Amino acid sequence: MIRILHSVSNMDRAGIETMLMNYYRHIDRSKIQFDFLCNKKKPGAYDAEIKEMGGNIYHTPGLNPAKYPSYLKCMKKIFEENPEYKIVEAHNGALGVYALHAAKVNHIPVRIFHAHGASITRDWKLPIKLVCKALLPSNMNQHFSCGIEAARCYFGEKVVERNDYELIPNAIEVNRFVFDSTIRNRIRHDNHLENKHIVGHVGRFMSQKNHTFLLDVFAEVSKRDSLAHLVLLGDGELMDAMKEKASNLGIKDRVTFVGNVGSGISSCRIGSEEKAIYPFLLL
């Protein structure tokens, strides 16, 4: 059996993690198994399902330069105790170089960097991320990307021109999102939204998802449509700030913050919407 060690932050319901689970559920797990390397200690929403399917979850120190000696020591122990690992795939953006360098030092032959974004977030970690990005080429030997722009961002124009990367689409289970009027009516009834014009958004509360602009837009929509109602699915560090913003805009009673819910519930709620809005930012 082939075991692939995926480096992520933790296995919560976020875009990259959900994409991995979509693939994990459909591969032949008698031939290939996924294990997960998490640099956050908190439990993830998918942990129980991963263990039920035969996967392992390892926790490491955080991804920052001060903790790297401890991180490297932890990784060495994992590889020594699991000599079957021949493939490591990093999904952490530029910080994925931590896992890839540890894999290289421990002689793991296949080291994949999987690009998921077309830009690098400009926050206080930016200088560290730029150094990590510069170190990626010497530590990875396989290029995966969800799209051309993400490949261009992390691998450079020459790699894209040579087509020297694997394009891995973010597959979804489309049948789960087929419209069902019965589900639509039930969701609306349960949430007292039978006669509302629902606008929906699914996304983690983080800067890239641009909830600030979304709420500004909906505030204007609500002035023109007295029946408009915004439903936000997801969780994240900016959720409380967005609740405060909705209150300040005077639309608190017209916005429902659902929080983090199971994927099945998400697909049902999406079916209850009339419109969806996704004002993402490239940071």
Predicted feature descriptions by range:
Residues 2, 6-70, 164-165, 237-238:
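N-terminal strand-loop element at the rim of the active site
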Residues 14-22, 197, 201-220, 230, ...:
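A conserved mid-protein helix/loop that constitutes part of the nucleotide-sugar donor-binding site
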Residues 75, 178-193:
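A short helix/loop element that forms part of the nucleotide-sugar donor recognition site in Leloir-type
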Residues 140-178:
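A short, active-site helix/loop in glycosyltransferases that binds the activated sugar's phosphate group
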Residues 90-96, 115:
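Short His-centered aromatic/hydrophobic patch
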Residues 105, 126-143, 163, 271:
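Membrane-proximal helix-turn-helix segments that form the acceptor-binding/catalytic region
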Residues 243-261, 270, 277:
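Nucleotide-activated donor-binding/catalytic signature segment of Leloir-type glycosyltransferases, i.e.
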Residues 36-44, 172, 202, 206, ...:
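Glycosyltransferase donor-sugar binding loop
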